[in-house]
């Protein structure tokens, strides 16, 4: 491993530079990767995430279209729009920003996206391909975590990897990617009886529970690699992760900060999936 603090901003910058070259090759063939981002409602955090994604697209030369719709929009209206984008050759990737308003089914909406344009990697077809070890698109956050571990020279073959959190977006696909890399994987959920004991077994500990401070330094094996996927607001309004950074950093061999760790990598891998989709469409 390299530095104790795993800098996701630095790693993502390297990936974006590589993507610029791939985009330039596509544009030399009169192909410009295109990403459509659909935002329903006025969720402030979603607004920020969408702006960050659009800005990242511009940096690497991806054409992006952002469509904002009111919360009163119906699910059928959104499904109709997705169907139209599925057939648009200028759009290689479709991203529906979550969460959606309560009257919409995220499952039905995600399943309406063509698996060939599902650059978030959430469609059931892409989840199945990931499960069988032949992914078409890897979900962006787990994909970014794997790239971070690779950039730090972390060997996963035979390693004990523990994931705190079992969501469809992070925990479950993260487990599949770690298994494919040769790790022995344990997933902890809200019913896990001895979370601290499980966490202390980890050579690589990935925390994605959505709860600030659920893991602290007393739960970490000395020298372990700690990846904090969480993003929360502390009592002071500042961003914080699921790991108590102060105590964890004293024990861990390497650790990601929040912000500046996994977040930039998630966006970088969204761009990578979009470029990959464009390259496939050009074959």
Curated annotation (Swiss-Prot):
Residue positions binding NADP(+): 165-167, 190, 231
GO biological process, one term: tetrahydrofolate interconversion
Gene3D superfamilies: Leucine Dehydrogenase, chain A, domain 1, NAD(P)-binding Rossmann-like Domain
Name of this protein: Bifunctional protein FolD 2
Segments crossing the lipid bilayer: none
Record keyword Transmembrane helix present: no
Keywords: Amino-acid biosynthesis, Histidine biosynthesis, Hydrolase, Methionine biosynthesis, Multifunctional enzyme, NADP, One-carbon metabolism, Oxidoreductase, Purine biosynthesis
Native source species: Bordetella parapertussis (strain 12822 / ATCC BAA-587 / NCTC 13253)
Keyword Amino-acid biosynthesis: yes
Subunit structure: Homodimer.
Catalytic activity line of the entry: (6R)-5,10-methylene-5,6,7,8-tetrahydrofolate + NADP(+) = (6R)-5,10-methenyltetrahydrofolate + NADPH; (6R)-5,10-methenyltetrahydrofolate + H2O = (6R)-10-formyltetrahydrofolate + H(+)
Similarity-based family: Belongs to the tetrahydrofolate dehydrogenase/cyclohydrolase family.
InterPro entries: Aminoacid_DH-like_N_sf (IPR046346), NAD(P)-bd_dom_sf (IPR036291), THF_DH/CycHdrlase (IPR000672), THF_DH/CycHdrlase_cat_dom (IPR020630), THF_DH/CycHdrlase_CS (IPR020867), THF_DH/CycHdrlase_NAD-bd_dom (IPR020631)
Enzyme Commission code(s) on record: 1.5.1.5, 3.5.4.9
Entry's Gene Ontology cellular component terms: cytosol
Pathway per the UniProt entry: One-carbon metabolism; tetrahydrofolate interconversion
A molecular function (GO) term: methenyltetrahydrofolate cyclohydrolase activity
Functional summary from the UniProt entry: Catalyzes the oxidation of 5,10-methylenetetrahydrofolate to 5,10-methenyltetrahydrofolate and then the hydrolysis of 5,10-methenyltetrahydrofolate to 10-formyltetrahydrofolate.
């Amino acid at each position: 491993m390299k530095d104790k603090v795993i800098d996701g901003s630095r790693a993502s910058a390297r990936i974006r530079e590589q993507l610029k070259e791939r985009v330039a090759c596509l544009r030399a063939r009169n192909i410009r990767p295109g990403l459509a981002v659909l935002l329903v409602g006025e969720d402030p955090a979603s607004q920020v995430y969408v702006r960050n994604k659009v800005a990242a697209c511009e940096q690497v030369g991806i054409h992006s279209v952002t469509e904002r719709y009111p919360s009163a929009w119906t699910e059928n209206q959104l499904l109709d729009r997705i169907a139209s984008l599925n057939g648009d050759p200028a759009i290689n990737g479709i991203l529906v920003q979550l969460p959606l308003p309560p009257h919409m089914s995220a499952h039905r909406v995600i399943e309406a996206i063509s698996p060939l344009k599902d650059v978030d990697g959430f469609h059931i077809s892409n989840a199945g391909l990931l499960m069988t070890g032949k992914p078409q698109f890897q979900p962006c956050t787990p994909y970014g975590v794997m790239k971070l571990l690779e950039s730090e020279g972390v060997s996963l073959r035979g390693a004990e990897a523990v994931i705190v959190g079992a969501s469809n977006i992070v925990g479950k696909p993260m487990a599949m990617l770690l298994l494919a890399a040769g790790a022995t994987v344990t997933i902890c959920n809200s019913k896990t009886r001895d979370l601290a004991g499980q966490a202390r077994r980890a050579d690589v500990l990935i925390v994605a529970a959505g709860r600030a401070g659920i893991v602290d330094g007393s739960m970490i094996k000395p020298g372990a690699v700690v990846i904090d996927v969480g993003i929360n607001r502390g009592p002071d309004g500042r961003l914080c992760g699921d790991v108590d950074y102060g105590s964890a950093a004293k024990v861990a061999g390497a650790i990601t900060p929040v912000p500046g760790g996994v977040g930039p990598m998630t966006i970088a891998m969204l761009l990578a999936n979009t470029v990959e989709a464009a390259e496939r469409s050009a074959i």
